[in-house]
């Protein structure tokens, strides 16, 4: 019996010594370090997905989806994407162009004749070079009833009525424009004969199996989505997180809840990764069309402005082409960054008014991916 126990003990020792616990992947350990620091020092609250060479290596959730109830975020949590939505608007235009229903250099008055401007093209709208002013300021100037939710047709009507001067001649400068992308959504609706939400669902979300993605207007629809990540703002005076609807400085979240094209796509990190993968294929549009979307446009003087169709464009000497977009709306700060040549991807969705946390995570994860790529 003693001999048996001795032999068993030796066998156990040999087994445990020959099969040590697998060390954590250095990249995952590095990402964990970034995220732990962001949570501890910057109050990061949200979901993160990191892909390496086209495969997900990290997907985690941090914090509550609802600070009132204490419900926690998970992989299926749905976030308002804010301006990350613009890439979907651009894709809708690209699809209609491939169908022969419009051209990038068409004058926008061909589709929205109410606009009081000449020389603005769809390409100008796609690349933020049209010179059109912002609708938010125009609505406020007109004395819009804050208890009334505006929609895209309201924006068109206000511009037709007020005829505000352009900020600059089309193509002369680059200036980010939410109005341009709202107008693009109106063009999609008028050309396709479908609502903007229907078009995105039928042509993008369903074909890509993005089951948790849709146009969603929290206040206008009255519908409550399961697993919804409610956007909260930390009130310094109250020392707690509150919904923006409860804070007087953010009353416009109600007024502008009906505007489509510049925001209001809602999605998950997992669905956005499906979107990321599809952009490498010709499932939605041809690869030639995608290449044009990922190429910086230029101004009238031929200088590049660093924006394609719905994406900021960056060329890194170590990692190649990077396309990205951030999204900001009261209670949300988001980022999607695609390393086109390597297949790496960073998706950061947050449901708190905390741009420093998003920026910290995005910049650090980019640095870690680039560093790892350089030492392969």
Where are these regions (language model features)?
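Bacterial Sec-dependent N-terminal signal peptides
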Residues: 1-26
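Short, conserved catalytic-motif segment at the N-terminal edge
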Residues: 24-79, 101-106, 163-164
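A short acidic/small-residue loop/turn micro-motif
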Residues: 63-67, 256, 353-355
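Short, glycine/proline-biased beta-turn/loop segments that scaffold the active-site neighborhood
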Residues: 104-118, 206-208
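Short, surface-exposed loop or secondary-structure junction motifs
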Residues: 119-326
């Amino acid at each position: 019996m003693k001999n048996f126990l001795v032999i068993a003990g030796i066998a156990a020792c040999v087994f445990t010594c020959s099969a040590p616990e697998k060390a954590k992947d250095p990249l995952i350990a590095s990402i964990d370090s970034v995220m732990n620091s962001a949570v501890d020092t910057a109050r990061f609250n949200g979901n993160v997905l990191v892909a390496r060479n086209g495969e997900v290596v990290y997907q985690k959730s941090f914090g509550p989806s609802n600070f009132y109830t204490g419900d926690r975020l998970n992989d299926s949590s749905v976030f308002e994407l804010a301006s990350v939505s613009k890439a979907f608007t651009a894709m809708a235009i690209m699809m209609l162009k491939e169908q022969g229903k419009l051209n990038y250099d068409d004058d926008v008055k061909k589709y929205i004749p109410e606009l009081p401007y000449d020389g603005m093209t769809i390409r100008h709208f796609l690349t933020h070079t049209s010179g059109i002013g912002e609708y938010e300021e125009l609505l406020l100037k007109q004395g819009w009833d804050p208890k009334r939710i505006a929609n895209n047709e309201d924006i068109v009507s206000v511009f037709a009525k007020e005829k505000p001067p352009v900020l600059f001649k089309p193509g002369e400068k680059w200036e980010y424009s939410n109005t341009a992308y709202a107008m693009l959504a109106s063009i999609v609706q008028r050309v396709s004969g479908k609502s903007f939400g229907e078009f995105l669902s039928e042509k993008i979300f369903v074909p890509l199996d993005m089951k948790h993605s849709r146009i969603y207007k929290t206040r206008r629809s009255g519908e409550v989505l399961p697993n919804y990540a409610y956007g909260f703002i930390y009130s310094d005076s109250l020392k707690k997180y509150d919904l923006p609807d409860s804070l007087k400085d953010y009353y416009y979240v109600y007024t502008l809840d009906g505007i489509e094209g510049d925001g209001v796509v809602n999605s998950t990190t997992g669905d956005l990764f499906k979107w990321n993968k599809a952009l490498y294929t010709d499932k939605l549009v041809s690869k030639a069309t995608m290449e044009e979307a990922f190429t910086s446009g230029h101004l009238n003087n031929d200088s590049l402005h660093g924006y394609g169709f719905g994406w900021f464009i960056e060329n890194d000497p170590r990692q190649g082409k990077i396309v990205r977009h951030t999204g900001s709306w009261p209670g949300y700060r988001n980022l999607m960054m695609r390393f086109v040549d390597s297949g790496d991807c960073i998706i950061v969705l947050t449901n708190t008014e905390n741009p420093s946390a998003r920026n910290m995570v995005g910049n650090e994860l980019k640095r870690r991916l680039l560093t790892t790529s350089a030492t392969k």
